[in-house]
Amino acid sequence: MIKDKESPIRSCHFVYIVALVFGTIIQFSDESEFVVDMSKTSLIHVPKDLPPKTKVLDLSQNNISELHLSDISFLSGLRVLRLSHNRIQGLDISIFKFNHDLEYLDLSHNQLQKISCHPITTTLKHLDLSFNDFDALPICKEFGNLTQLNFLGLSATKLQQLDLLPIAHLHLSCILLDLEDYMKENKKESLQILNTKKLHLVFHPNSFFSVQVDISANSLGCLQLTNIKLNDYNCQVLLKFLSGLTGGPTLLNFTLNHVETTWKCLVKVFQFLWPKPIEYLNIYNLTIVESIDEEVFTYYKTTLKALKIEHITNKVFIFSQTALYTVFSEMNILMLTISDTRFIHMLCPQEPSTFKFLNFTQNSFTDSVFQNCDTLARLETLILQKNELKDLFKTSLMTKDMLSLETLDVSWNSLEYDRSNGNCSWVGSIVVLNLSSNALTDSVFRCLPPRIKVLDLHNNRIRSIPKDVTGLETLQELNLASNSLAHLPGCGIFSSLSILIIEHNSISNPSADFFQSCQKIRSLKAGNNPFQCSCELRDFIQSVGQVSSDVVEGWPESYKCDYPESYKGTPLKDFQVSELSCNTALLIITIVVPGLVLAVAVTVLCIYLDLPWYLRMVCQWTQTRRRARNVPLEELQRTLQFHAFISYSEHDSAWVKNELIPNLEKEDIRICLHERNFVAGKSIVENIINCIEKSYKSIFVLSPNFVQSEWCHYELYFAHHNLFHEGSDNLILILLDPIPQYSIPSSYHKLRALMAQRTYLEWPKEKSKHGLFWANLRASINIKLMEKAAEIH
């Protein structure tokens, strides 16, 4: 047996104690200076510096051995005092005479041997003196004045009826009686346990059950026994002891904690309790020893509604499975819970069963359980959590004959659904289905009961909801938390959906159309997702602001940006993005329109100021300087005698002689002209070739007159031939006057090609541009020549 002196109370008064303690603490928790928790701090005495306004004081689990009046007398407003699990040996009740508001006093699990009785505040509701070293019951006559007392915890090695007389008139809610150190005597005592609704008896954990006292209680509604060790020989002792406690018509709840027994004795206890008026039987921490054999059990008509067994340790390794399971499967009760027992199976009842509620949590049931079982037609709730179910298709087959089944919980298994097995065959009555914490994927939506209203699929492997799913029009609550969904589903296939839980998924951009699609939604939990704060999310945030604050649960604290990094951790309600960056049309208007206006303005300005002409001049000058640097200076100086040969029409000679030559030769530039540099006696063609070869550049003054001159055509031909023969770039075209294309004879194809392919200098009519024109032209022909005669010999 396991000795559990730390927490002997399992039910009965447990709820009352928790409510009183925590209710009191919660009442003052808003003012933290009123609550002092110094438990587990190795104190050896009560601290002297406690706040005078302390209302809740916890000094439990320390090493305090003495209590003095001065320790707590100044705490006039003290309501809760916890001193359990210390080393206190003596108690003088007078130390509490100044604590007029004291309601809760816990001195359990100390070493108290005696109490000095004095009047005590009548406000006390909870007094626990259990698990101490008292010989007799520690009851003072002054306790009779505690008219508000609800809970009383006692312990003693000897029990006498007279000890209870001072409080016989009180109406208590719960009495805890510690009998761990009770000394058996030859004389059997009879003990009347007052008027209490709940009675909890704690026995020695390592001794076989043996009690030399008859205990009875008036109006007892709840009985709890802790530390019961039985075998086939002393089993009757327990049954005899219970006969005096279980005979009353008011006892409805019976609980056994930490029970070690044989299977035979356990069946006897069941058989003993079956005709009793008890309605709820609970057994926690049951250990079965020795053997498990088939036992005869007669299922009388019983008032028992529910049997609950939690945590069975079976120390019998070889036994008949049928002998064990049959006793439970054939019970004629409404509710049966057998959890944390590691049963591997449960039999189908042989006759139509009365079961309406079955709970087999944390066992080892497989897919074969309840297959082809047609005797559970009244079953309404079936819980098979934490078992070894693997096939959802077989689970659906299990339910086909459970015609009244409404709630099925098969969470925390290893369920999968393979469509190749066929369509699922659920019973049509199921409205609540828990499939959470399994291995289900998207295909699960094709294997659901037809009238399902509440569906829990959280913690599975679902990535999306198929759009072609049908038959879910009645679904009202859907839990898809902790899956891998990337999108917030709409209600196209869930027309009745009112509650959706989809937190802890992979949703980054929930659709703003959700609330339009889901008109009946009353609750949405979509927090704790990796939201990508972008323009798309802005619409969803706006839609959240348009619905009631009660609809979107966890808003705004659970809704935060996850990406980009600059917004990570930012609540969605604080995410701001400009209209310009999200509205493409507005962005185009804002950027493109001003750009177009600027471009038009620049174009007009350039045309007005003739900027293109200036740009062309600068580009030509730059290109000319670059090409000149690429030709070796020595080569140029060795062969060239002139900077430029000028070819022009006689009709343009006035401009050449008055404008062109003076502006070039004033910079020490040598110009070759036919009237002064052609050699007499040579042919015109030979002179043209020599002049072109001896000149760095050949300048052609183009005009309508130029195209009418045959010799100009020859000069252009030879210059063009020299351009391709030597790979040089020696042609400079000056457009003196515009030449219409139609005026160029077809025989002047080279001129057409040159004007189409090469950049030419255009003589500006505005005088302000002449300076740049001459500078550009001089730069294109300027090169240092070797000192030679300008004449051609």
UniProtKB/Swiss-Prot annotation:
Q: Where are the LRR repeats?
A: 54-77, 78-101, 102-122, 123-147, 148-168, 169-196, 197-219, 220-250, 251-277, 278-303, 304-330, 331-354, 355-378, 379-404, 405-428, 429-449, 450-473, 474-495, 496-519
Any keyword Phosphoprotein?
Answer: no
**Annotated glycosylation sites:** N63, N145, N253, N285, N359, N423, N434
* Database matches in InterPro entries: Cys-rich_flank_reg_C (IPR000483), Leu-rich_rpt (IPR001611), Leu-rich_rpt_typical-subtyp (IPR003591), LRR_dom_sf (IPR032675), TIR_dom (IPR000157), Toll-like_receptor (IPR017241), Toll_tir_struct_dom_sf (IPR035897)
* Membrane topology, Cytoplasmic segments: 606-793
User: What SUPFAM superfamilies does this protein map onto?
Assistant: L domain-like, Outer arm dynein light chain 1, Toll/Interleukin receptor TIR domain
Task: Name the chain's protein.
Answer: Toll-like receptor 6
Organism of origin is: Bos taurus
Encoded by which gene? TLR6
